[in-house]
Design a protein with these regions (language model features):
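Short regulatory helix/loop adjacent to the ATP-binding pocket of P-loop NTPases
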Residues: 131-135, 192-208
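Intrinsically disordered, low-complexity basic tails and flexible linkers associated
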Residues: 1-119, 124, 183, 189, ...
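Sensor-1/coupling segment of RecA-like P-loop NTPase cores
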Residues: 172-173, 177-200
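Conserved ATPase-coupling elements of RecA-like P-loop NTPase cores
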Residues: 158-171, 195-198
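Nucleotide-binding/hydrolysis machinery
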Residues: 191-201, 215-226
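Walker B catalytic acidic pair
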Residues: 155-157, 189
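Short glycine-rich substrate-engagement loop in P-loop NTPases that contacts/grips substrate
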Residues: 110, 115-151, 164
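Walker B beta-strand of ABC/ABC-like P-loop ATPase nucleotide-binding domains
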Residues: 152-154, 185
């Protein structure tokens, strides 16, 4: 009996959070997008969620600047895929805590639903993985891998601007996850309506759920952070 192998993404974060192995179909026909649940050839994967345990809600300081986003995030974590906040689109300038908040949601999902597969990935890493899958002639494996995620967190989604093929594959992943009741969490430096270089069909989907902004902290919140 073959042991499952581990899929890891480069990270300096040490985490005790683990996903259960997931089954993904392999050796699929090229240039086809099929239902992954009916394709033969299954391999067990261990998926590293890539969540930094320091980025929890416990360590996330709440203030007027982030109250809506945090409340929505906690609602999503309590019932991933089961709220109107799907996707949850968190936006704001760099350094305001988008990564922390998005990972806090993932951490809470894992705490409350250990059986769910959670994955955090930066949009640039997603792009790199997709390019590598094309180079290695296994695009469908890439597609089916992401279609197996229960809660998918894509950080800095605006970095897919101008990357048409990557946007196309993400469009199919988004549709599959949304239609099967899985949770999507996206972060960006701008609200959906202001995104440049992103296909309109994606922007319209980004607006299906809730867009919540993170603002610069007020004095009271800055004091709490200190």
């Amino acid at each position: 009996k073959k042991k499952p192998y581990t899929v890891k993404f480069p990270t300096n974060n040490k985490t005790e959070l683990k996903n259960k192995p997931v089954s993904v179909p392999l050796k699929t026909e090229e240039n086809s997008i099929k239902n992954p649940f009916v394709i033969p050839g299954i391999k067990k994967l261990h998926v590293d969620p890539r969540l930094n345990p320091d980025n929890s809600f416990t360590n996330y300081i709440e203030g007027e600047c982030n109250r809506l986003a945090r409340s929505a995030g906690e609602a999503v974590a309590d019932k991933p895929g089961g709220t109107a906040f799907n996707p949850l689109f968190i936006y704001g300038d760099s350094g305001l805590g988008k990564t922390h908040l998005s990972q806090a949601i993932g951490i809470k999902v894992k705490e409350q639903y250990p059986e769910k597969t959670v994955l955090y990935v930066n949009a640039n890493k997603f792009q790199t993985q997709f390019v590598e899958s094309i180079r290695n002639n296994n695009k469908n494996d890439f597609l089916h891998f992401y279609q197996m995620i229960d809660t998918l967190i894509i950080d800095d989604i605006h970095e897919l601007a101008g990357k048409e093929k990557t946007q196309d594959i993400f469009f199919h992943i988004f549709n599959h996850l949304h239609q099967t009741g899985k949770q999507l969490i996206l972060t960006s430096d701008k609200p959906p309506i202001e995104l440049q270089g992103i296909e309109q069909r994606l922007i319209s989907r980004f607006k299906w759920g809730l867009s919540a902004d993170l603002q610069a902290p007020d004095l009271e919140t800055r004091i709490k952070i200190l």
